[in-house]
Amino acid sequence: MAAAVLNPGFFLLILLLSFSISPSLQYVSESEPLVRFKNSVKITKGDLNSWREGTDPCSGKWFGIYCQKGLTVSGIHVTRLGLSGTITVDDLKDLPNLKTIRLDNNLLSGPLPHFFKLRGLKSLMLSNNSFSGEIRDDFFKDMSKLKRLFLDHNKFEGSIPSSITQLPQLEELHMQSNNLTGEIPPEFGSMKNLKVLDLSTNSLDGIVPQSIADKKNLAVNLTENEYLCGPVVDVGCENIELNDPQEGQPPSKPSSSVPETSNKAAINAIMVSISLLLLFFIIVGVIKRRNKKKNPDFRMLANNRENDVVEVRISESSSTTAKRSTDSSRKRGGHSDDGSTKKGVSNIGKGGNGGGGGALGGGMGDIIMVNTDKGSFGLPDLMKAAAEVLGNGSLGSAYKAVMTTGLSVVVKRIRDMNQLAREPFDVEMRRFGKLRHPNILTPLAYHYRREEKLVVSEYMPKSSLLYVLHGDRGIYHSELTWATRLKIIQGVAHGMKFLHEEFASYDLPHGNLKSSNVLLSETYEPLISDYAFLPLLQPSNASQALFAFKTPEFAQTQQVSHKSDVYCLGIIILEILTGKFPSQYLNNGKGGTDIVQWVQSSVAEQKEEELIDPEIVNNTESMRQMVELLRVGAACIASNPDERLDMREAVRRIEQVKT
């Protein structure tokens, strides 16, 4: 019997049918383990109702799920939902391409679940839960692809598992704020890819391995481990008693060879010293109070850690000019508390020498208004304001002052313009005061003296992007959603485009763009500050104070340009998207993340998704937009400025990104 001849088209039909059927089968197979995972835990602060069996987890509708190329589940990011119960890791083994698990800020407890069964994991983030107990020493031996491990702010006990030090690709390890004991494995110092090691706030003991201290490009935090000594922690080991582990004694702790009688004598001496010190402060307080009564016309606005002080000395009016200025200050409510007629003289400097002076009403000692959108005020109004130190920046110190009218302002004392003549300073300040753009912080006023320059601007209650992104872990930080971060990036881009048009003739229209100079309004609208200062600074001061001088081109050619501002914009874009503090902001480059190298290498390997801050990843569609924006940031930080986007093109591409 002749064999039947099959039409080749039949095989093609079978092949096409298999392709058309396989995606739906993939959806079903991946939705089932996710639904089982959802059913195994309790949710107290939200829901996962979008997780429905038989639907496509990669449709963009499943909360907290993101997918690789929109086809297969690669990440589970379920945070702040009050999850509790038992995680069955076996359910997740049916997700073959799962790379990231993020369950931080929940209520999960008990021993660490058996995540070692998921050998393909690259990121495991379990911060801020209540996991407890010891972690098996060999727990991580099969997780060779793991890059980021966050176990911080839990209740883990025992020693650090040695298998962690055998993870060849590990870049970040966070185990701070647990109850870990024992010594730090020296093998951390030989882990080639390790960039961040945070073991702070534990009960670790012994000598910090020299290999960790010697490792370059490693950000280490070992603070609040009482019994550690040696390098990194800067605690000598002379007073550390290393116990014989065979004796079963507790971990090594500081010991003392001083007899008990000597201790009692020392305590008595300390008590006597404290009593004398208290008596001294009482005497000083009495003297100060008497001096205040004799000299009520001297007030200190603020001081900082470097003993810089902001002082305002009020002297009796003694000239016709002073009389006129006093009259004008009375109209503004600027007379002194005791009803006497005063004139304002700024005295801002180290040690409060009390020198210098000039009449109000436009004289050397007055506040010059350049923007009256928030009303007018004078130096006496600032003098009567409650003031506090905000901090020190690369250009000087900043102080917050709340005036009696309720207006809160920031007074920035700029230390690197002391040799600047009055005329160029006046011209620039008045020009700044005319700027109007929703993303530019326009100064309200300024004060000129040969020795001191002050710039007054409106206070932003949400502070800077730097603080909200890295320093605050409260409500402000939690509100930095993907939509909010995109709004900030686009606002910064619009502001920079405006500055590059307004100051097109300047080498650096901004020159100092970084997250500390991006302030946030109540609605998270970004306002750019500290711009266009280059013409006002001495070249030597500018190269030290302005961030644009940390660009690759300045290091290579000692030149800066408009493209240097583009580089700074790229750093901010990447900082916002990754949530990482850039090491580029630090003078010594130690600490933070080398965000340029990290991004460039990941983009080259087409691993952009791994760079995105897990806190803002919700679905596949938003991930696509984030990656697109990240590529714009990467195009802004090319080492060769000729290969960077120009500002106009960068802004155009940023505007195209939608939430």
UniProtKB/Swiss-Prot annotation:
Membrane topology designation: Single-pass type I membrane protein
GO terms assigned for molecular function: ATP binding; identical protein binding; protein serine/threonine kinase activity
Primary site of residence: membrane
Biased composition (Basic and acidic residues): 324-341
Extracellular face residues: 27-266
Cytoplasmic face of the membrane: 288-659
Protein's cellular compartments: Cell membrane; Cytoplasmic granule
LRR repeats: 95-118, 120-142, 143-167, 168-190, 192-214
Keyword set, alphabetical order: ATP-binding, Cell membrane, Disulfide bond, Glycoprotein, Kinase, Leucine-rich repeat, Membrane, Nucleotide-binding, Phosphoprotein, Receptor, Repeat, Serine/threonine-protein kinase, Signal, Transferase, Transmembrane, Transmembrane helix
Location of the region described as LURE peptides binding in the Swiss-Prot/TrEMBL record: 226-242
Domain notes: The juxtamembrane domain (288-383) is required for interactions with ROPGEFs, while the kinase domain (384-659) is required for pollen tube growth.
Domain (Protein kinase) ranges: 384-659
Residue ranges of the TM segments: 267-287
Mutant phenotype after disruption: Impaired response to the ovular attractant LURE1.2.
GO CC terms, sorted: cytoplasm; plasma membrane; pollen tube tip
Function text: Key receptor for sensing species-specific attractants in cooperation with other pollen receptor-like kinases. Essential for pollen tube reorientation toward attractant peptides.
Residues that carry a glycan: N128, N179, N221
Source species: Arabidopsis thaliana (Mouse-ear cress)
Subunit-structure text: Interacts with ROPGEF8, ROPGEF9, ROPGEF12, ROPGEF13, PRK3, LIP1 and LIP2. Binds to LURE peptides via its LRR repeats; interacts with LURE1.1, LURE1.2, LURE1.3 and LURE1.4.
Signal peptide: 1-26
Name this protein carries in UniProt: Pollen receptor-like kinase 6
Chain positions with Phosphoserine modification: S464, S561
SUPFAM superfamilies: L domain-like, Protein kinase-like (PK-like)
Similarity comment: Belongs to the protein kinase superfamily. Ser/Thr protein kinase family.
